[in-house]
Amino acid sequence: MAKRIITISREFGSGGRFIGEEVAKKLGIAYYDKDIIGQIAEQSGLSPEYIKENAELSPKKGLFAYAFAGRDITGKSIEDMVYEAQRKVILELAGKEPCVIVGRNADYILKDRDDVLNVFIHGDMPEKTQRIMDLYNVEEKEAVKMMADTDKRRMTNYNFYTEQKWGKASNYTLCLNSSQLGYDRCEKIIMECGK
């Protein structure tokens, strides 16, 4: 069965966002990443700025803080409301048209569909560090810290909401090392597997 939907999960600095965008362009299909923040904000009733800062990063302080987080009258935390809004938006987008969706636990949210190709992009530390230094104009020490912090927040969010382990190969159809394969080959492999 052809894969209508491609989800891209990625380590920070691996180029996963770039690879996803290029695959969407080459296939002539929709690409969703940060641009769905407005839709998530509308669905949740929270500001786009709040969603941008918190959608992939909650729960912020672990289970203890989560237990005491602010809740609405139904008992849902703000983090849960954001996740639920994100889930609804992703399901709507996947039902509407072929697309590439980057991040936001889309692989798990769409796990019951047969027409989804789930990809995890990772890379080697030196290449990821250099990419972050170049993209964000930071020194090596800051790049390493940004990488560790971002991946830790992504992992915490993913593990909490999916009850799976972020980056574990069995959760994905493909795991690709962008440092070893290069972006171009990653794109070609994804497109070939999506046929």
Model regions and ranges:
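Conserved phosphate-donor/acceptor-positioning beta-strand/loop module used by diverse small-molecule
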Residues: 112-134, 140-148
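Glycine-rich phosphate-binding P-loop
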Residues: 8-21
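Small-molecule kinase domains that catalyze NTP-dependent phosphoryl transfer to phosphate-bearing small molecules
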Residues: 59-66, 139-184
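RNA pseudouridine synthases
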Residues: 93, 109-112
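Short, amphipathic alpha-helical "lid/cap" segments that border enzyme active or binding sites
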Residues: 87, 183-191
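Pre-Walker A (Motif I) flank of P-loop NTPase domains
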Residues: 2-11, 97
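ATP-dependent small-molecule kinase phosphotransfer cores
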Residues: 41-98
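Short beta-strand-centered segment that lines the nucleotide-binding/catalytic pocket of NTP-utilizing
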Residues: 30-41
